[in-house]
Amino acid sequence: QGKRHWLNDSYWLVMPYKLKDAGATLKYLGTESTQTGKPADILQLTYKTNNLSPGIRHKIWIDKKSRLVSQWAQYAKLTDKQPLFVVPWDDYQQHGDILLASERGSHDISDIMVFTGLPGEVFSDFTRTDLSRYHEAK
């Protein structure tokens, strides 16, 4: 159950890095503007093997100027014409050694925290941990 939640939830934070996942298949689809009118290259992301979400397809807009992911769509099935959602991918900020975006339209992420290390109890105690008491990477 935890793995299923992590696979789903991690997309909302680190989806651009999923382009390099083992089993990822990328296909160049051409060029298209985002919903805000910015020109982008389009990639399709599918997985050869993904037992937790078989058949899901992603459409990813790569901004022509910044070369960063600028929009993301997810389709429930490979053959679906209409996506489940289309969200912007904006407001990139440096968090330690990683570049992350927080703007997702109505799904914005406002509490991104990146750590260089955490004590073991964070991973073994299933009560909600107050992560603000630990030192964040800058």
Task: Please identify what each model-predicted range represents.
Residues 126-138:
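Long terminal segments
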Residues 39-129:
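Gly/Pro-enriched, hydrophobic low-complexity segments
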Residues 1-56, 79-80, 135-138:
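Flexible, processing/modification-adjacent segments and terminal tails
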Residues 12, 17-18, 23, 67, ...:
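A generic structural signal for solvent-exposed, polar alpha-helical segments
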